[in-house]
Amino acid sequence: MDNITTERFNGVNLSWLDKGQGKAVVFVPGSNGDYRAWLQQIDEFSKHFRAISVSRRFQFPGKYQNGGSSTVDENVDDIKQLVDHLQLDKFSLVGHSFGGYVALAFAEKYPHLIDKLILEEPTVFPFLMTKAFNPLKLIPLLFKDFAAATSFMRTGIRGIKPTRKHLSNNKIEKAKLSFANGIIGHPVTLDELNPVMLQGLDDNIKTFAAESKTAFAYPLTIESMRKMKVKTLLLESDKSPNWFAYICKNLARTLPDAKLVSIEAPTHWLHLDSPVEFNRVVMNFISEA
């Protein structure tokens, strides 16, 4: 078994798996994930790179503290303290979902540290709306892209809102199921889920209360993204709810040096569903001059 390191940064415990040698590649999980979400990447990438998989604040083996905060800002600061501790000079950064939003914000704040940026369906909410839990804020998106707006509303109605409600009532199994239904985009059973995803839900679902509360609060603007010079790879699934593709396509148009690749995958978790293709595409991108 690989050894996991845990240290305290920014007032919280962070854990990570560090394997391999060479150019560093740091993997940041999304909501309800942790370092284990990337094990199929770590095993392959560590043959060619120094692969580092991070558990963000409160993620397994950590535990959520009631009332704990997990903003984009805080997660960016956590990762900065971690990479300073690891003495990483320049590295590639891979982020999934909310972890992709964190990775983008990190690259915008510390571009000199980033060699390549890989964003797997990042939840960059400024492209959708600027304030959470207010349907009126979706009206501009309805006129821009009706399919993206309605799919995001379905995710909110089926996933985000009931998950938060179930967590507040300590109905953990219902919270896990509503989260999966909302993000996958159609009704599922927990038994149908990828075992790694289910493991992440089992151990991390309580962290969603903090992350969903502040996910819209980070001041990442279109103007600031247009100034980013980091080479960026955007990855989208061909089966995810439409709003993920909407964000990816808008990022591809906004970031000065970005390319978008679609991977056949049944859910938002491309790196779990299609690991061979995911690994091939990402490693090729990192290896490019």
What positions do the PLM features span?
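Active-site loop/oxyanion-hole signature of alpha/beta-hydrolase fold enzymes
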Residues: D43, I52-F98, K109, T130, ...
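Active-site loop/turn elements of alpha/beta-hydrolase fold enzymes
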Residues: R56-F58, P122, A265
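Flexible "cap/lid" loop of the alpha/beta hydrolase fold
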Residues: D115-T163
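Conserved serine/cysteine hydrolase catalytic core
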Residues: L190-N250
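Catalytic active-site module of serine/aspartate enzymes centered on a nucleophile-bearing elbow/loop
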Residues: D257-A289
